[in-house]
């Protein structure tokens, strides 16, 4: 039996008998290899991915087929372009567009050795905007990506960013509830809270992954990390992360805080993100830079400019208003006894008295006001209930700050917890 794909992928000595020349390996996976390949016809470079189907489970075979099915339906400058595929002797060959500058993970990893620098704000913003445009296209075609991570963000010498690897992609139909999938998949560091809680999820899970990726681009590290999955789940569900570098504007950091919200109902869609004034302005700057870039084909520019123009001209959806700049409501007042989870290694719950008054959260040891600590509501990102499975206590709610810090409180009843969450949301102008 001859080697599979011998008439398609060969070596330099077989140029006249094959369509592509193997120019060297670029990656290894559990079930195969990826090669840089040169098309004999015109000398252009692409990537040839060869996978051994005989070693795969039924589920992994479905994921392999996804790498063909979904990119075939995608035609966008910020998504790796599918070229062709072949199957022979239990081997699958997929030929895809080649990105000549590696992937984003390779740009971030050197930071751990000290051999790297932070991205400048406009660089990080333009990376993020292109990924948003790719995800907007994917979601508009009723697809989920489900494996957004730095290793799947491919870079080119033209400045274009390409989202690749559709192995976990999923096609869906819109439903009344907006819930479309339940399969637990993707890379753990980027998984949304709803997946850790084994809940059904929708395109907001992709948005969470994009938020984790944006934090990684800005901070050169992941927002949530641990030595095991249980520890990672705990950190993701707690929703706390280290502040981003001061070199980035507060407006840009607020974008991260707005995305990394545990409740998907309070998390913006990609389209709603575009309505944030900072992002909206960034899109206009991106188009200006795009038009001046002589390394990008005019036909590619036209596609991106057309998409951005459509986004900028679209009306703000009713739901999007709650993701724009909020207005602190100084009239909201709420007081009551709570238990607060302390920090440090010996974490314990301690009785406290909490107040919302005149645009501030004030925490004291008792109702008499001893040992007061205040927090301006402008520094509060949101509040949400914490499931019993996570908190191991009833009636717990979390308060998240703009800087990424979190505080957990235990109310005296379920109704009291709901009143606290609603009062905080009213106070910060999102309810």
Curated annotation (Swiss-Prot):
Keywords: ATP-binding, Kinase, Nucleotide-binding, Serine/threonine-protein kinase, Transferase. Transmembrane segments: none annotated. Its EC number is 2.7.11.1. Gene3D superfamilies: Pleckstrin-homology domain (PH domain)/Phosphotyrosine-binding domain (PTB), Transferase(Phosphotransferase) domain 1. Pfam families: PH, Pkinase. InterPro entries: Kinase-like_dom_sf, NEK_Ser/Thr_kinase_NIMA, PH-like_dom_sf, PH_domain, Prot_kinase_dom, Ser/Thr_kinase_AS. Residues 331-429 form the PH domain. It catalyses: L-seryl-[protein] + ATP = O-phospho-L-seryl-[protein] + ADP + H(+); L-threonyl-[protein] + ATP = O-phospho-L-threonyl-[protein] + ADP + H(+). CDD domains: PH (cd00821), STKc_Nek (cd08215). ATP binds at residues 26-34, 49. This is Putative serine/threonine-protein kinase B. It comes from Trypanosoma brucei brucei.
């Amino acid at each position: 039996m001859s080697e599979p794909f011998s008439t398609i992928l060969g070596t330099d000595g077989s140029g006249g008998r094959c369509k592509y020349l193997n120019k060297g390996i670029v990656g290894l996976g559990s079930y195969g290899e990826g090669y840089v390949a040169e098309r004999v016809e015109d000398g252009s470079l692409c990537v040839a991915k060869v996978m051994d189907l005989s070693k795969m489970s039924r589920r992994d075979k479905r994921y392999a087929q996804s790498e063909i099915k979904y990119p075939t339906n995608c035609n966008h400058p910020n998504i790796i372009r599918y070229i062709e595929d072949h199957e022979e002797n239990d081997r699958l060959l997929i030929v895809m567009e080649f990105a000549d500058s590696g992937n984003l993970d390779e740009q971030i990893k050197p930071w751990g050795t000290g051999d790297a620098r932070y991205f400048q704000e406009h660089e990080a913003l333009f990376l993020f905007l292109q990924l948003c445009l790719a995800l907007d296209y994917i979601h508009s075609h009723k697809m989920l990506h489900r494996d957004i991570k730095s290793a799947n963000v491919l870079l080119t010498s033209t400045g274009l960013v390409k989202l690749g690897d559709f192995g976990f992609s999923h096609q869906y139909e819109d439903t009344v509830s907006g819930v479309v999938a339940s399969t637990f998949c993707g890379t753990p560091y980027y998984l949304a809270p709803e997946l850790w809680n084994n809940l059904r999820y929708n395109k907001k899970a992709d948005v969470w992954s994009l938020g984790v990726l944006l934090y990684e681009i800005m901070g050169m590290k992941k927002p949530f990390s641990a030595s095991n999955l249980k520890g990672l789940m705990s950190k993701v569900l707690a929703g706390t992360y280290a502040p981003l570098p001061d070199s980035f504007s507060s407006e840009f950091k607020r974008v991260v805080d707005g995305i990394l919200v545990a409740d998907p109902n309070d998390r913006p869609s990609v389209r709603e993100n575009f309505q944030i004034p900072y992002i909206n302005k960034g899109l206009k700057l991106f188009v200006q830079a795009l038009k001046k870039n002589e390394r990008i084909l005019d036909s590619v520019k036209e596609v991106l400019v057309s998409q951005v123009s459509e986004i900028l001209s679209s009306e703000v959806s009713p739901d999007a208003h709650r993701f724009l700049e909020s207005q602190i409501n100084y009239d909201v007042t709420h007081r009551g006894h709570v238990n607060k989870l302390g920090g440090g290694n010996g974490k314990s719950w301690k009785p406290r008295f909490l107040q919302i008054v005149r645009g501030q959260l004030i925490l004291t040891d008792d109702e008499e006001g001893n040992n007061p600590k205040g927090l301006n509501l402008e520094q509060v990102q949101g509040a949400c209930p914490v499931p019993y499975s996570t908190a191991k206590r009833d009636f717990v709610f979390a308060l998240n700050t703009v800087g990424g810090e979190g505080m957990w409180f235990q109310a005296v009843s379920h109704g009291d917890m709901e009143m606290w969450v609603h009062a905080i949301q009213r106070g910060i102008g999102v309810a």
